[in-house]
C-alpha cells in the first residue's frame, strides 16, 4: 500500500470512527439530547420553576407514581420514562413535542393517570411523559354558561368551581373526582347527567391542541374534522390537548338518591335484575337507576359464615322524595322503595355521594373533598366493559352471577349502567363515540386487589367472565369503550404494512363506523404517525392517500 493510499485509508477510518462514535453517543443519550434541545427552547431562569425531571432527580419517582391510579403498574418491571415534563403553559408542551421528535422519543400524555392499561405513562420504547398536573386552571363565564378548563384539571375541580359560581350549573362528566379532563373528555366521558345531556365530549365547544408541528390550534384553525376527532376519538392520537371549552348545563336545586341492598339467593336477585334490565333504559331522562353486584361474607340464621352475592340498586332523580317513591312503587314495586330509603341532596352533594371517595353512610361530607387529588383508596385493578342490546336471559344471568364466587370475596364486581334518554337521540356519527340508540345498558366487570403477585389471578378472572358473557352482549363487532381501554382487544404493530388492518379489529369495537373517518383525520394531521401507542389510530400509507 503506497503512502497516499494509506493516508486515504487512515483518514477514512478516522472519519468512520468519529461518525460511529457520534452516532453511538446520540443513540446512547437521547435523554441528554432532549434536555439540551428543551433548554434551548425554554431557558431555565428564576421565573421558570423546575419543569423537567429525570431518573437522577430526587422527586422523579414520587412525581411518576403520584398519579398512577392502577397499582398494577407501580413495579420495578414497568417501563419508566427517560424524562417527565410538567408544563405550566403551552410553550412547554410545544418544546416537548419538537424536542421529542428531534431526538426520536415517543410521548405519553398524562392528565389524571386513570388509563386502565397505564398507557398515559407506559411505553415499550424510549419515551417522555408530559404530566399536565400544573395546567389546571378553570375559567368560568356564568353569563354565557361556558368555561375554559385546562387539560390537567380533575373532574372534582371542575364540579367544585362551577358550583362555587352557580349551584344550578354543572357539567356532564364522570363520577370519579380524581379523573383528569384531558383523557376523560377526549374518550367520551359518561356520568350522572348522560341521560339528560349526553357525554362530556358532546358538550365541548372549543379546544386548544398542540399539534405535531408544535402549533397551538383552536377549533377554527384546526378545522371541524380534527375538532370532531378529538371529542371521543382519543386526543392523544392527534396531538396534546392543552385545554377544553365546555358548555355548562342546568342541574336541579335538589335531587333524590337511594342505594338499597338486596341480599337473597341468586334466583331472587336475577328476577330483580331482569325487571331492571327491561325498564331502566326506558325511564324518563331525569332518573338514573343503576345496579351492581358483589360478594360479601355474612352470618346466617344458624350463626354460620357464608358468602353470598349482594345486589345494590341506586338512583339519581331530578326531583323530590315523594315523586321518586311514587314512580318506583308504580314502575318497580319489587324493589320496595320507601321514603326512609331516600335522601334529598343538592346536586354537588349528590356528586360527592357517588364519587367513590366518601363513605356511603356519611352525611356530613364537605365539598372540598372534590379538590383532593389523593382522595379515595388506590388498588390494583382490571376492568372490561360490554354494551348490551337485548335482554340477557335469566338462566344466563344466574351463571354470570355465580362466577363472582370464583373470585376472592369482595374483589370482583359487576356494574350495570342504563343508557336511553337523550343518548337515543344523538347520532352515532355526531362524535367518534358511536354507542347511542339501541344500547340498553353497559355492563362492566372489574376486580381490585392489593398484592402485585396476585395480578395474573385477578386479571384472568376478569377475562374469564368476559369470555363467558360473549353470547349475551353486542356482537359483530363486540363493542368497547375507549376510556376503559383494553389491550386484549388487540395491539397495532406500527412498523407493519398491515397496521391499518390490525387496528381496524379493535378500532371498530371502540368507534364503529367512525373508525375510518378517524384514520382519514390522522392521515391528514399526523401522516408520519408521531403520536402513537399500542392502540392508536394509524395513518394510511402514502399510496393509499
From Swiss-Prot:
Q: Tell me which residues are glycosylated.
A: 65, 89, 168, 297, 305, 329, 467, 499
The source's superkingdom equals Eukaryota
* Pfam families, alphabetized: BBE (PF08031), FAD_binding_4 (PF01565)
Q: Could you tell me in which tissues this protein is expressed? A: Expressed in the secretory cells of glandular trichomes.
**Binding-site residues, FAD:** 109-115, 120, 176, 180-184, 190, 236, 241, 481-483
Residue stretches making up the FAD-binding PCMH-type domain = 77-251
Post-translational modification remark: Glycosylated when produced in a heterologous system. The deglycosylated THCA synthase has more catalytic activity than the glycosylated form.
Residue sites binding cannabigerolate per the record: 292, 417, 442
The function of this protein is: Oxidoreductase involved in the biosynthesis of cannabinoids-related terpenophenolic natural products, which have pharmacological activity. Catalyzes the oxidative cyclization of the monoterpene moiety in cannabigerolic acid (CBGA), producing delta(9)-tetrahydrocannabinolate (THCA), the major cannabioid in drug-type Cannabis plants. Can also use cannabinerolic acid as substrate, but not cannabigerol or cannabinerol.
Task: Identify this protein by name.
Answer: Tetrahydrocannabinolic acid synthase
Q: Which organism is it from?
A: Cannabis sativa (Hemp)
The opening ranks of the lineage are: Eukaryota, Viridiplantae, Streptophyta, Embryophyta, Tracheophyta
Recorded name of the encoding gene: THCAS
Amino acid at each position: 500500500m503506497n503512502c497516499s493510499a494509506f493516508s486515504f485509508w487512515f483518514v477514512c477510518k478516522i472519519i468512520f470512527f468519529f461518525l460511529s462514535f457520534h452516532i453511538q453517543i446520540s443513540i446512547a443519550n437521547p435523554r441528554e439530547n432532549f434536555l439540551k434541545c428543551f433548554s434551548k427552547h425554554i431557558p431555565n431562569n428564576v421565573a421558570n420553576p423546575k419543569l423537567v425531571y429525570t431518573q437522577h432527580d430526587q422527586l422523579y419517582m414520587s412525581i411518576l407514581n403520584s398519579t398512577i391510579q392502577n397499582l398494577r403498574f407501580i413495579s420495578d418491571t414497568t417501563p419508566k420514562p427517560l424524562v417527565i415534563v410538567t408544563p405550566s403553559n403551552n410553550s412547554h408542551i410545544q418544546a416537548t413535542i419538537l424536542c421529542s421528535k428531534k431526538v426520536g422519543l415517543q410521548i405519553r400524555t398524562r392528565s389524571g393517570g386513570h388509563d386502565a392499561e397505564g398507557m398515559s405513562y407506559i411505553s415499550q420504547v424510549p419515551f417522555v411523559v408530559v404530566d399536565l398536573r400544573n395546567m389546571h386552571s378553570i375559567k368560568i363565564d356564568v353569563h354565557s354558561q361556558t368555561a375554559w378548563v385546562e387539560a390537567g384539571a380533575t373532574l372534582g375541580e371542575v364540579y367544585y368551581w362551577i358550583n362555587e359560581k352557580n349551584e344550578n350549573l354543572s357539567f356532564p362528566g364522570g363520577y370519579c373526582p380524581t379523573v383528569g379532563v384531558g383523557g376523560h373528555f377526549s374518550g367520551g366521558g359518561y356520568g350522572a347527567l348522560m341521560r339528560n345531556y349526553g357525554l362530556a365530549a358532546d358538550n365541548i365547544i372549543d379546544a386548544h391542541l398542540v399539534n405535531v408541528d408544535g402549533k397551538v390550534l383552536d377549533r377554527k384553525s384546526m378545522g371541524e374534522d380534527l375538532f370532531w376527532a378529538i371529542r371521543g376519538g382519543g386526543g392523544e392520537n392527534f396531538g396534546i390537548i392543552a385545554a377544553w371549552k365546555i358548555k355548562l348545563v342546568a342541574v336541579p336545586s335538589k335531587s333524590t338518591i337511594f342505594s338499597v341492598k338486596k341480599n337473597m339467593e341468586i334466583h331472587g336477585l336475577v328476577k330483580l335484575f331482569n325487571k331492571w334490565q327491561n325498564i331502566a333504559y326506558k325511564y324518563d331522562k331525569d332518573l338514573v337507576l343503576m345496579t351492581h353486584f358483589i360478594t360479601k361474607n355474612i352470618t346466617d340464621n344458624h350463626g354460620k359464615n357464608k358468602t353470598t352475592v349482594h345486589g345494590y340498586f341506586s338512583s339519581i332523580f331530578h326531583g323530590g322524595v315523594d315523586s321518586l317513591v311514587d314512580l318506583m312503587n308504580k314502575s318497580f314495586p319489587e324493589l320496595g322503595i320507601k321514603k326512609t330509603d331516600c335522601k334529598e341532596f343538592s346536586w354537588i352533594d349528590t356528586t360527592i355521594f357517588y364519587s367513590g371517595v366518601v363513605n356511603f353512610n356519611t352525611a356530613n361530607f364537605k365539598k372540598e373533598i372534590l379538590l383532593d387529588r389523593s382522595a379515595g383508596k388506590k388498588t390494583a385493578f382490571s376492568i372490561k366493559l360490554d354494551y348490551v342490546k337485548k335482554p340477557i336471559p335469566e338462566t344466563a344471568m344466574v351463571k354470570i352471577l355465580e362466577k363472582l364466587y370464583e373470585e376472592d370475596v369482595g374483589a370482583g364486581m359487576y356494574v350495570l349502567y342504563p343508557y336511553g334518554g337523550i343518548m337515543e337521540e344523538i347520532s352515532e356519527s355526531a362524535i367518534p363515540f358511536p354507542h347511542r340508540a339501541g344500547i340498553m345498558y353497559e355492563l362492566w366487570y372489574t376486580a381490585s386487589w392489593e398484592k402485585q403477585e396476585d395480578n395474573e389471578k385477578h386479571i384472568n378472572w376478569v377475562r374469564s367472565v368476559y369470555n363467558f358473557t360473549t353470547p349475551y352482549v353486542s356482537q359483530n363487532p363486540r363493542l368497547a369503550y375507549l376510556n376503559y381501554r383494553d389491550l386484549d382487544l388487540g395491539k397495532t404493530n406500527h412498523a407493519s404494512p398491515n397496521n391499518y388492518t390490525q387496528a381496524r379489529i379493535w378500532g371498530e369495537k371502540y368507534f364503529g363506523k367512525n373508525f375510518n373517518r378517524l384514520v382519514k383525520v390522522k392521515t391528514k394531521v399526523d401522516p408520519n404517525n408521531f403520536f402513537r401507542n399500542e392502540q392508536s389510530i394509524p395513518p394510511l400509507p402514502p399510496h393509499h392517500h
